[in-house]
């Protein structure tokens, strides 16, 4: 593996992004060997990562939104190599990047390639991996059903608008949650199982989550009496509902839902009646800003 070889896996819709082109050119002018591959359809990111690992690339850059980031991160982790991950946030929500303190400007984001990569955890559920968060309940449906055109025009506010227009469909989910020293059963409106802190366009469901603590943060919003009003508050930023959440920090979590539970894994839908969530400590090395809020400690000196 050549430690200087970097490959940017770029979402196809960003191929004409002039800021990205300028940032890539600046990195090359500074002496970095930076190649670019563009995705076109589902599965491309995984295939490109596999080919890059076989070709000896030392670092992969995920250029896109949270979905692209999840695909690249999962493929890297399954490759079980030494390659690291950098993040070029180009989506609508960019939830993981925002929580981690990664700049949204392409040049500043690519400058993090100079930061030492830190080992971070990945979440897993029923054989699938996720970098940021698994969400369930009404919130996962909002995220999954928010159109790409609406997100392009309104940005993160698109999630709020979609939620508001779907109030007539609101109904609570029912589940039983089991983990070491944690048991909860009942109806809930929203669920977050976080490696990261926020999802769905800026909704901070797991405010204390860290990506290097070997644990998952669980946040359950039990069904309140004023369900529609509470949902509006949650989608509008969450102020005023913090005290309603049931929270835990666990190495694994089992969820049983007799009627099935819709879960969103960083943009990928999953449904099941029995789900087991776990964490893979230090599964991936990622270039994060010094002092990132998602890290527990500064890097060790070699």
Swiss-Prot record:
Keyword vocabulary terms for this entry: ATP-binding, Cytoplasm, Kinase, Lipid biosynthesis, Lipid metabolism, Magnesium, Metal-binding, Nucleotide-binding, Phospholipid biosynthesis, Phospholipid metabolism, Transferase
Domain of life, source organism: Bacteria
DAGKc domain segment(s): 1-129
Residues binding ATP, per UniProt: 39, 65-71, 92
InterPro entries in the cross-refs: ATP-NAD_kinase_N, Diacylglycerol/lipid_kinase, Diacylglycerol_kinase_cat_dom, Lip_kinase_YegS, Lipid_Phosphate_FormReg, NAD/diacylglycerol_kinase_sf, YegS/DAGK_C
PANTHER family documented for this protein: LIPID KINASE YEGS, SPHINGOSINE KINASE
EC number(s) on file: 2.7.1.-
Active site residues per record: 268
Gene Ontology biological process terms, A to Z: phospholipid biosynthetic process
MF terms in GO: ATP binding; lipid kinase activity; magnesium ion binding
NCBIfam families attached to this UniProt entry: lip_kinase_YegS (TIGR03702), PRK13054.1 (NF009602), YegS/Rv2252/BmrU family lipid kinase (TIGR00147)
UniProt name for this protein: Probable lipid kinase YegS-like
Subcellular location: Cytoplasm
Family: Belongs to the diacylglycerol/lipid kinase family. YegS lipid kinase subfamily.
Binding-site residues, Mg(2+): 210, 213, 215
Native source organism of the sequence: Pseudomonas aeruginosa (strain UCBPP-PA14)
One GO location term (cellular component): plasma membrane
Cofactor(s) needed for function: Mg(2+); Ca(2+)
Enzyme class: transferase
Cofactor binding mode and count: Binds 1 Mg(2+) ion per subunit. Ca(2+) may be able to substitute.
Job of this protein: Probably phosphorylates lipids; the in vivo substrate is unknown.
Classification via Gene3D superfamilies: 2.60.200.40, Probable inorganic polyphosphate/atp-NAD kinase, domain 1 (3.40.50.10330)
């Amino acid at each position: 593996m050549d430690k200087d070889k970097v490959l940017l896996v770029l979402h196809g819709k960003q191929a004409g992004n002039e800021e990205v082109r300028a940032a890539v050119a600046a990195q090359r002018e500074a002496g970095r060997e930076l190649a670019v591959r563009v995705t076109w359809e589902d599965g491309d990111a995984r295939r490109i990562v596999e080919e890059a690992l076989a070709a000896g690339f030392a670092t992969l850059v995920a250029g896109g939104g949270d979905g692209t980031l999840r695909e690249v991160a999962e493929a890297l982790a399954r490759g079980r190599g030494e390659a690291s991950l950098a993040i070029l946030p180009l989506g609508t929500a960019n939830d993981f990047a925002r929580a981690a303190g990664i700049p949204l400007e392409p040049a500043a984001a690519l400058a993090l390639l100079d930061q030492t990569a830190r080992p971070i955890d990945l979440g897993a559920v029923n054989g699938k991996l996720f970098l940021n968060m698994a969400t369930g309940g009404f919130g996962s449906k909002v995220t999954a059903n928010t159109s790409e055109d609406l997100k392009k025009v309104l940005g993160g506010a698109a999630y709020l608008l979609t939620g508001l227009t779907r109030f007539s469909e609101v109904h609570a989910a029912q589940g039983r949650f089991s983990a070491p020293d944690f048991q909860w059963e009942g109806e809930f409106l929203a669920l977050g199982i976080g490696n990261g802190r926020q999802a769905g366009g800026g909704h901070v469901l797991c405010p204390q989550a860290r990506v290097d603590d070997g644990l998952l943060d669980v946040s359950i919003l039990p069904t309140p009496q004023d369900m529609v009003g509470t949902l509006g508050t949650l989608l509008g930023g969450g102020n005023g509902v913090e005290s309603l959440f049931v929270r835990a920090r666990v190495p694994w979590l089992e969820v049983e839902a007799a009627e099935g539970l819709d879960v969103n894994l960083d943009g990928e839908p999953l449904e099941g009646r029995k789900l087991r969530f776990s964490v893979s400590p230090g599964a991936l090395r990622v270039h994060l800003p010094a002092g990132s809020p998602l890290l527990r400690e500064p890097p060790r000196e070699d």
